[in-house]
Amino acid sequence: MFNIPEQLLLNMFSRIEEGYPDNPYHNRVHAASVFHMMHLLIHNGLIQQGVLDGITMLGCYLAAICHDYDHSGFNNDHLIKTKSPLAITYNDVSPNENHHVAGAYTLLLSSPDYYFSKDMALEDRNILRAAIIELILATDMKKHLACSRSFRRVYSTACLCDCNQAQIVNHVF
């Protein structure tokens, strides 16, 4: 769809994976699980329903793989209460999630070996970036309940391929 060279994608994914610390939960295995779940959601309903265009779909995949990039291992409440550098930098607003976005984008823009969007139209790059930012910021647990409700509302109107898919989605969200 975007003709991104395979080697560039492999380079990018390898570098993103290296940016995941060995935390008990927010680690590369968790990122791969979220990426896989995003793939299942996209290909078992969202594309068929016309909910996603290509740029947004790419944004979903990138947000999934980057959503906990360089995670500190501490939750936002702890970072804010302890006045951590991340909390100070991001003015106590979703410090982890803002850091994940900023860190991942800093990485992606740092080398032509993994800067895949350089050949995209400016408008598409802006749409992609906005989607990634919105999706990663939505992973803040303070926003999770509202996001889950919204997701359930959208997915409940989607025509899923079978009852098992609907049960899986309802169990996850």
Question: What is each stretch, according to the model?
Answer:
Residues M1-P95:
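Acidic/His-rich, divalent-metal-binding segments that scaffold phosphate/diphosphate chemistry
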Residues T56-F173:
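Divalent metal-dependent catalytic cores for phosphoryl transfer on phosphate-bearing substrates
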